[in-house]
Amino acid sequence: MDTMKVNQKQKEYYLEQGYWGHETLLDRFLRTVERFPDREYVVDDRGNRHTYSQVDVLSSRIASYLKDMGIKPGDCVSFQVPVWSEFAVIAMGCLKAGAVMHPIAMCYEEPDLIHAMNKSDTKIYFGTAWFRGKDYEARLLAVMDRVAGLKHAVFLDSLGPVKGGFTTYREILETYDPLPREEYGLMDGLEVALILGTSGTTGSNKGVMLTHSNIIFSEEQFNLELGLDENDIMFMPAPLNHATGFHHGIIAPM
């Protein structure tokens, strides 16, 4: 992944003004888990419902897998997952391992997958084996040898079987213990947390690198301007790889 380029003078200004800080998205999530452990965090259209504490436990199992596969702070993990509860679990698992999150649009086919995962230097891919009658496992198999850094792939099998011998999301949750907090990957609020892809309307999609501080400040202001607090519920129909879906659907509620 290309080095994050932030104007040093501007960064110092953001810090002085209190816009940016060293707090991370994981810090925010864990604080919310402590405050509202039994409150629902995510509900999807398949009937899955998870509280903050449930996502905390499930994501810690994902983090254990990521660490076991050699993921280190700053490594990129890509996930091509619909608007499902698993998206939030995988995202929080990445944060606990210190990985950079890289959600990918469900519409990406071979050329876009190759480009996006090579540019981000993806180490591990999460996806659904099937979605809307399309074989996403076969699509990933067709590009794996053309993504230089990609070592492992994990598939959700809720809509169809995984045929290629890949690890499944279900297997991770059943076999890995939650990663202890003292083993979480250490990150800083000024470091890159997320890569979002542009639409690619004028050429190949580009990866927009966002720091923890970028996202925290953005969603603090979003909630403030709309008067949102812990008593509100966010309905998010937008794709979660989109800035609207990710920021307002995954981050704002925490």
What are these regions (language model features)?
Residues 7, 131-189:
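ANL superfamily adenylate-forming
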Residues 81-84, 105-107, 191, 228, ...:
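Conserved AMP-binding
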Residues 21, 38-92, 109-114, 165-174, ...:
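Conserved AMP-binding/adenylate-forming core of the ANL superfamily
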Residues 76, 82-102, 106-110, 118-125, ...:
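A short helix-loop-beta submotif of the ANL/AMP-binding
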Residues 49-53, 193-217:
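Conserved AMP-binding A3 loop
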Residues 37-38, 155, 160, 174-197, ...:
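Conserved pre-ATP/AMP-binding loop-to-beta segment of ANL
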Residues 216-233, 241-254:
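Conserved AMP-binding/adenylation subdomain of ANL enzymes
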Residues 1-50, 54-69, 73, 142-149, ...:
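N-lobe entry segment of adenylate-forming
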